[in-house]
């Protein structure tokens, strides 16, 4: 979970109230966080967050905003955000080339002016950059942030591609290095260049006079990408592969800098083709949607009897604009710096936090029951122990994923997969119908680890089912992957035989027609003449889609069918 260090004096100054340590500890719990350490000598507080859904809190400005809002009940306002029907004036432009749009497509930025950067402010900004890029940005793969002195930049900025031979002087060096040399020799290149595995073009940020700003998301240039004590005018950019995550990250930084005293000046990004929010986006940009909440649903889940007005007041303590037109429903507008409301239940949780947990009385259960493991869970544990005994490492994945990973890379039509009707992000728009894509994705980022690789997961998958009343069916599946240059169909066939031997289940195989496998190297598994799964050598075409260079063998089987 994210941990941050903040200056206590700066936090209290932003809150506008001199809270005791006890008061601070109590109110920080409303941010799903706890104080780990108070360093009186260095004026620092170490805080650990128990939730990764609130990156807006991972800074002194963001946490102070939360506490100040909770104490006052006043929703903060930011007048520099553009909306679909209310575009702000922009003070610079970023042009995205068609070539980079296929590699790392999204970039947004803004200018910040009016404050002098001292050592503490630089430390705060660098920590914010690291936490957003590493934690929320998945080690810069999903999102990464860059900071520059805007006095050195000639707008407009061009976001383009370059070859591995392109040279500039990177931050922390005194000599020119090619992109290839940065990837192989620079500490940041060694750490983050796997983001660009199996590509021959790399992202590059240039100003109007072709001065290099950075090689995002790897390293800034030494000349323009160095922030120093005394700088007053900043340019902030965020690049990423997820549109909404990139926009949200930029919004968080803009709000933090505004709360620190900067004036925020919007910048327009021009894309080569349409995005979800248009071809031209002026940022910071408010993209979140309103939610309609049923009052009865809130009271039923909380065991309360609150009115719509009560709930709206409680939500405002969390910075959430809420209003009601009728007594049985109300509407909320997420704050500009939040995008974690996926369901009505998320809003109900905020009502509970706003009301205060102390205001809910504890109740003993009315019924007494004895719990026990379900048959499928007992069987799953047996299978899990067998897999671990055969040298496999267990993985745990999300059930939601992207169309790219679940359909396009797997080379399937996807007609049986379930899609989310209103996904908050493209990364979670489909419910998985197979575990194999997750295993292949893990293998694609594991090439630096010694072979052989042997991983597995026992988890749920869901598919359309026109026969059932719900229209869907959920299975518990076992899937495993073996990766090594020596692995072939013979090895996985032997392992499957061992697995079924120890489970004491008879089975048959027949040649599989799935395009997941190399022709003649895949087999369907039949138990009592019913196909429950398959195994084989993965097709080179699918391996190349995931950027995997080593032969892989996979199995996936429905363990509900094995149990029954």
From Swiss-Prot:
SMART domains: B5 (SM00874)
Record-given protein name: Phenylalanine--tRNA ligase beta subunit
Record keyword ATP-binding present: yes
Intrachain disulfide bonds: none
Subunit: Tetramer of two alpha and two beta subunits.
Positions of the B5 domain: 286-362
Cofactor names: Mg(2+)
UniProt cross-references to SUPFAM superfamilies, sorted A to Z: Class II aaRS and biotin synthetases (SSF55681), Putative DNA-binding domain (SSF46955)
UniProt similarity note: Belongs to the phenylalanyl-tRNA synthetase beta subunit family. Type 2 subfamily.
Keywords assigned by UniProt, alphabetized: Aminoacyl-tRNA synthetase, ATP-binding, Cytoplasm, Ligase, Magnesium, Metal-binding, Nucleotide-binding, Protein biosynthesis
Cellular-component GO terms for this entry: phenylalanine-tRNA ligase complex
The protein's Enzyme Commission number: 6.1.1.20
């Amino acid at each position: 979970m994210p941990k941050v260090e903040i200056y206590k004096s700066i936090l209290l100054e932003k809150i506008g109230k001199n809270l005791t340590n006890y008061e601070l500890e109590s109110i920080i719990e409303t941010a799903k966080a706890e104080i780990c350490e108070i360093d009186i000598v260095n004026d620092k507080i170490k805080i650990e967050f128990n939730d990764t859904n609130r990156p807006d809190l991972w800074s002194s400005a963001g946490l102070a905003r939360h506490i100040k809002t909770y104490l006052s009940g006043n929703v903060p306002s930011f007048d520099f955000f553009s909306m679909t029907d209310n575009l702000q004036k922009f003070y610079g432009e970023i042009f995205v080339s068609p070539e980079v749009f296929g590699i790392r497509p999204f970039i947004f930025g803004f200018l910040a002016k009016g404050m002098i950067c001292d050592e503490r402010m630089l430390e705060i900004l660098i920590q914010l950059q690291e936490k957003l890029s590493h934690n929320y940005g998945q080690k810069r793969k999903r999102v990464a942030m860059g900071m520059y002195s805007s006095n050195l930049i000639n707008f407009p900025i061009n976001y383009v591609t370059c070859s591995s031979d392109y040279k500039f002087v990177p931050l922390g060096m005194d000599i020119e290095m090619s992109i290839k040399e940065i990837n192989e020799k620079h500490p940041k290149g060694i750490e983050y260049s796997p983001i660009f595995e199996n590509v021959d073009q790399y992202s590059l940020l240039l100003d109007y006079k072709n001065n290099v700003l950075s090689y995002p998301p790897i390293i800034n240039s030494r000349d323009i990408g160095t922030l120093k004590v005394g700088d007053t005018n900043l340019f902030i950019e965020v690049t990423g592969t997820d549109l909404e995550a990139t926009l949200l990250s930029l919004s968080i930084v803009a709000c933090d800098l505004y709360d620190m005293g900067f004036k925020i000046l919007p910048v327009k990004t021009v894309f080569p083709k349409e995005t979800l929010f248009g071809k031209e986006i002026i940022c910071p940009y408010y993209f979140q949607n309103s939610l309609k909440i049923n009052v009865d649903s809130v009271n039923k889940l909380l065991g309360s009897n609150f009115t719509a007005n009560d709930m709206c007041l409680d939500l405002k303590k969390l910075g959430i604009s809420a209003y009601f037109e009728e007594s049985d429903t109300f509407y909320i507008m997420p704050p500009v710096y939040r995008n974690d409301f996926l369901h009505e239940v998320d809003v109900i949780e905020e009502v509970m936090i706003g009301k205060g947990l102390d205001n809910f009385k504890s109740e003993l259960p009315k019924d007494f029951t004895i719990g026990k493991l379900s048959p499928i869970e007992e069987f799953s544990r047996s299978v899990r122990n067998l897999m671990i005994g055969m040298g496999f490492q267990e993985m745990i994945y999300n059930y939601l994923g992207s169309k790219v990973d679940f359909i396009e890379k797997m080379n399937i039509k996807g007609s049986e997969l379930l899609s989310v009707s209103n996904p908050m992000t493209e990364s979670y728009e489909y419910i998985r119908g197979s575990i194999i894509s997750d295993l292949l994705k893990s293998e694609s980022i594991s090439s630096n680890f010694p072979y052989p690789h042997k991983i597995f997961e026992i988890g749920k998958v869901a598919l359309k089912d026109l026969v059932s009343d719900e229209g869907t069916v959920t299975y518990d599946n076992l899937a495993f992957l073996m990766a090594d240059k020596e692995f072939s169909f013979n090895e996985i066939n032997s392992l499957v035989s061992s697995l079924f031997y120890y489970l004491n289940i008879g089975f048959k195989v027949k040649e599989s027609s799935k395009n997941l496998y190399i022709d003649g190297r895949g087999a369907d598994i039949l138990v009592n003449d019913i196909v429950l799964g398959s195994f084989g050598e993965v097709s080179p075409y699918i391996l190349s889609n995931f950027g995997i260079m080593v032969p892989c063998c996979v199995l996936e089987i429905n363990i509900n069918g094995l149990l029954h």
